[in-house]
Regions:
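Short amphipathic alpha-helix with an adjacent loop that forms part of the alpha/beta core around
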Residues: 68-75, 239-243
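A short N-terminal interaction module
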Residues: 75-130
Length: 363
């Protein structure tokens, strides 16, 4: 049994894992789920974590037991190991009595595990069961940082982060070919290259963006010693050509708002953008293989009176039910819906324009 420890956006991490398992043909069976981790029975390899954008740790579960039996467990020499605890803070006191190296906040970050070369064990509180085991794989934040900050062209205030781009690539389930028709500086293309997708098509209506993408993709090929066919050209996403297996993209999300606006203004912006998105989806229908996926980021505006969403039904496509393999009682208890918002704060403040991750299948 294994546990996958989620990043900050647990629903996004979960959606990525399920899509990744399906794409890679990983046979798995559900065991338990919390907002911190997914427990599964499966054949897992530690290197898998390098292919994921939203998983922080993989833990090999050695034992599981009822909450009330925590103090009866024999943890052997592991009591001298550093431990991370995911779940109820009410049980921290009991864990502290058993383990000598209990961190102040209850969790050792993946950054510290990599930086300080620490080996640890984890205790995960599920719905009714405790799961205990050794961490066998850790996501390396310095790899993502290199992929972001070392490339020649950067636009931190606008570009999607490499970890989020990798999640989009995995949600698309692309194996042989992928397209990003709003490529910007090429972050999604870069992650597709690192994922080993052999044919990558990038385009943008902005000629500067095309040049930026070319520079960044050339750098990525050299820096990570990757080969593959990468075609980058100036093109309007409303007039696509060619043929592709899947699309992963973050289109224009509208103006970068600094403060909340009225619902009327928010709907006006969303309405303008929706026209662009509809035209893109119509165009994509002609190049996307039947059954192929579009993994896309859409904007949600935090207006003064509440959230304003894009109308998410597009002709010729069906939304993918990302969580249908999660048992219904868990979906009900954890309030899992097909809406995945990335509301990570920006410089300590709530974002006005929030990313919504959506996946569609061509029919």
């Amino acid at each position: 049994m294994f546990a996958f420890i989620f990043g900050k956006n647990w629903m996004l991490s979960l959606a990525e894992l399920i899509s990744y398992f399906e794409k890679e043909g990983v046979e798995w069976s559900f065991v338990d789920l919390t907002k911190k981790a997914l427990m599964v029975e499966a054949e897992i390899w530690p290197e898998m974590i390098d292919e994921l954008g939203g998983t922080l740790k993989i833990v090999q579960i050695d034992k599981w037991f009822d909450f009330v039996d925590l103090n009866k467990q024999d943890f052997g020499d592991y009591v001298d190991w550093p431990i991370s605890v995911y779940g109820s803070h009410l049980l921290f006191k009991d864990v502290k009595k058993r383990f000598k190296r209990f961190p102040k906040d209850g969790v050792i970050s993946h950054t510290d595990l990599i930086k300080k070369k620490i080996r640890e064990v984890c205790l995960i509180f599920g719905m009714k069961t405790c799961y205990f085991g050794e961490t066998i794989a850790v996501s390396n934040p310095y790899d993502f940082k290199k992929r972001d900050e070392s490339r020649p062209v950067q636009r931190h205030e606008l570009a999607i982060a490499p970890s989020r781009a990798r999640i989009l690539v995995n949600l698309s389930q692309a194996r042989e070919s992928i397209m990003d028709p709003f490529c910007g500086i090429g972050t999604i293309g870069q992650e597709a290259l690192l994922a080993g997708i052999p044919k990558i098509f990038l385009s943008d209506i902005d000629k500067r963006a095309v040049e930026w993408s070319k520079r960044n993709m050339e750098w990525a090929k050299k820096a990570f010693k990757k080969k593959g066919s990468v075609i980058i050209e100036t093109k309007d996403a409303r007039n696509l050509t060619g043929s592709v297996e899947a699309i992963a993209t973050e289109p224009d999300l509208g103006p970068r708002l600094q403060y909340r606006i009225s619902e009327v203004d928010a709907k006006q912006i969303i309405g303008y953008l929706t026209d662009l998105y509809r035209a893109f989806f119509r165009s994509a229908h002609g190049v996307l293989n039947t059954g192929g996926r579009i993994a896309i980021v859409l904007p949600c505006i935090n207006a003064k009176s509440g959230k304003v969403f894009v109308h998410k039904m597009f002709d010729g496509y069906r939304p993918v039910s990302l969580f249908e393999k999660i048992p219904q009682p868990y979906r009900d208890y954890l309030k899992i819906r097909n809406t995945i918002l990335d509301e990570e704060r920006e410089e300590g403040k709530a974002r006005v324009v929030v990313r919504e991750f959506c996946v569609y299948r061509k029919v």
